[in-house]
């Protein structure tokens, strides 16, 4: 087969195919042109997700009549000259986009410059006067009509529209000073008005409402780098590495920044999850190369280590400040689960009452009289339930409170009440009438109420109040600790909290040198484990662990780090051999070992604690950083606002 030169038409279509893979690419190029033109308002209209129509309208500076024919020529641009190649400040610069779109569609461009409007047909190159009064309007019809192969590879309308929405959201996110509107098949998808950066994030909900409510916002400048970071709390994670990254106003994918952010969160989130973050970086244009990808979606930093150090420093310090914070999504999920449970219980009660009514239980005259009387008492009681004990004593109303002392039981008692506990509390005839409606023994009841009030006050004087976690109230199921503040109830997972405390305490000893053992310890292992340890002898020495191979299935341990002195050596060495299979750095290895030890040594569920032990745990949670999540990224506590609890009981 002879070599021949391709026709220019085929060459152009091949080149256009590299730039335009799908409708979203065409939308991207047109919207970026509008941004570069200084627009403050951009409107995108679609029909059949761009296959039939893409119309982009802006209020930018416009294109003059003389420049309109040049705008659709290949490599024609107003944004770049020879000496600017390494100082690119615009989103578009190659002069390829409009030419590629013109080749693959039927395109018209109308623009107003200095009060004069003109339109050009990209196919005929004819320029005519136009009524446009401001900015530029680009209309693209029948995209890919002359490249059938492209049409065949387009995905469903829903998928293609999602790509366009994601693209526009990212451009809107980094340009909050520009209003964006998207209309698809005559339906408005979104309309974002100009806003501050934070307000724009709330408008977009790109990462969800939860992210906006559970993030750390930090700005920092150093070494010619400006960074604005929105970092999700450690308990807010995702399964994909999908941080939103913007460099010099350009949405990009960058492996350096992504890896830095994962490393910054390494100490706080589970192994196979990723942080949620939005990163804005600005550097001098000659410090970053944006001309390495056809769609300009990747960049290359001149000195990536400088960027790495900057981001790692800023994000690490910011995460330190979040301390005991845990995301509100945890509480939201809890309230949602409570609501679901409440619906089920309410449905069950309605069904039970319905069946009881049908059985004729409430049909007897005595039953009806009792119900009427109860309702009358309830009306009198309503509005008086906030009275104190003295007011109640002087009131002539037909009620007083029960003197049942069961609710004053010690908080740490875990005795499970049975039906016998309740049935034996009162004689049968007393059980048949609610204590709230009793009329007799008023004086005795009042005396008992006052005694309870005095005892309760003495008990309150002994209660310890914690700044963050309020007052300790009780332990539930030997697993959860309940505290309360003025406006919240807090549920603490004692194992998760203690695990994090132990881990943070052990981290302080990371730099401690290894200690020689008085007697070297012989540890039998599998052949594979011995091979792994032998291969990593030098790495282990860096963390103060000295091991020596003595056979194909055993090692001798001569020195251990201080933090491991109370850990069974054979168990420790087995864990280390397992971790070393991942080829991790010494510092990360030590952190993983500490995390494993902390998990094993922390107090377990179903373990009753004394008040003193619980108060000590709460004190440590207040004093030690990062107690908002355990070593695996799970929350150590959730906060249920009082208002949400009241809603569960329909008190709102």
Swiss-Prot record:
Give the residue spans that cross the bilayer.
none
GO MF annotation terms: ATP binding; ATP hydrolysis activity; ATP-dependent DNA damage sensor activity; mismatched DNA binding
Q: Which GO terms describe its cellular component?
A: mismatch repair complex
Coiled-coil annotation reads: none
Keyword annotations of the record: DNA damage, DNA repair
The record's listing under Gene3D superfamilies reads: 3.30.230.10, Histidine kinase-like ATPase, C-terminal domain, MutL, C-terminal domain, dimerisation subdomain, MutL, C-terminal domain, regulatory subdomain
Q: Which GO terms describe its biological process?
A: mismatch repair
Which SMART domains does the UniProt entry name for this protein?
A: DNA_mis_repair (SM01340), MutL_C (SM00853)
The record's section on Pfam families has: DNA_mis_repair, HATPase_c_3, MutL_C
CDD domains named among the record's database cross-references: HATPase_MutL-MLH-PMS-like (cd16926), MutL_Trans (cd00782)
Tell me the InterPro entries matching this sequence: DNA_mismatch_repair_CS, DNA_mismatch_repair_MutL, DNA_mismatch_S5_2-like, HATPase_C_sf, MutL/Mlh/PMS, MutL/Mlh/Pms-like, MutL_C, MutL_C_dimsub
Q: What's its job?
A: This protein is involved in the repair of mismatches in DNA. It is required for dam-dependent methyl-directed DNA mismatch repair. May act as a 'molecular matchmaker', a protein that promotes the formation of a stable complex between two or more DNA-binding proteins in an ATP-dependent manner without itself being part of a final effector complex.
Q: Per the similarity annotation, which family is this?
A: Belongs to the DNA mismatch repair MutL/HexB family.
PANTHER family tied to this protein:
DNA MISMATCH REPAIR PROTEIN MLH, PMS, MUTL, DNA MISMATCH REPAIR PROTEIN MLH1
Q: Can you say what this protein is called?
A: DNA mismatch repair protein MutL
Which gene name belongs to this protein?
Answer: mutL
